[in-house]
Amino acid sequence: GHSFPTRRSSDLVLYEEIDSNLNLSFKYRKSKNQVEKNKICKQAAEYLEEGQCIALDASSTALLFAKYLIKFNRLTIVTNGLYTAMALKDHPNLKVILIGGLVSCKSGSIEGILGKEIIPKINIDTAFVSAHGFTLEEGLTDFNIYECEIKKLLVERASSIVGLLDYSKLEKHSTTSFADANKINTIITDDKTPDRKSVV
């Protein structure tokens, strides 16, 4: 079976809780499960090194992850998250590249492929991405087709892909795939995984 490193930490729950209502406002999602999301971000920060170029998606977890980046002396961050870019813009030690496109009023994400020309010019060391679902057959999937276009381009340019997924996302799938399972290097999840052998 497929094998890749899996990181777990007790009491990690949801990084982004979107159960039946897929259109919860970003502000509402950001306010949920702050403790759990911060634990996920803390583990993800262990994969950061000085001088790296990393990609962040437009999730509420990425915005929390931003506070772990400001302690570094030299990082380049590529993101389609407007709020994440704004949170990092006042730190001269960080170079922030915001991908252009249509701004979503609900999530503050940049959608579509208007800015796709710049992505192939960037060498990304690690892409940190969330998803609505993950299966070995379909990989990482999400429900926003337009945002997935950007995510797919980012992970294709990344040397390493780190998925931020709680147990409820495993063995579930959504509308659009943006990263194959065999391309994912690490998944940071929790210890509530019901059938670990199906994942690890």
Predicted segment positions?
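Helix-turn-helix/homeodomain-like alpha-helical modules used for DNA recognition
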Residues: K27-K71, L75-N80
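Conserved catalytic alpha/beta core of Sir2/sirtuin-type deacylases, generalized to analogous enzyme cores
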Residues: S20-K27
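Short, small-residue-biased leader/transition segments that mark boundaries at the very start
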Residues: H2-S9
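Short glycine-enriched loops at secondary-structure junctions
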Residues: L12, Y83-T84
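Conserved phosphate- and dinucleotide-binding cores of soluble alpha/beta proteins
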Residues: A85-S198
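Low-complexity/repetitive intrinsically disordered segments
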Residues: G1-H2, V199
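Minor-groove-contacting beta-hairpin "wing" of winged helix-turn-helix DNA-binding domains
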Residues: S10-I18
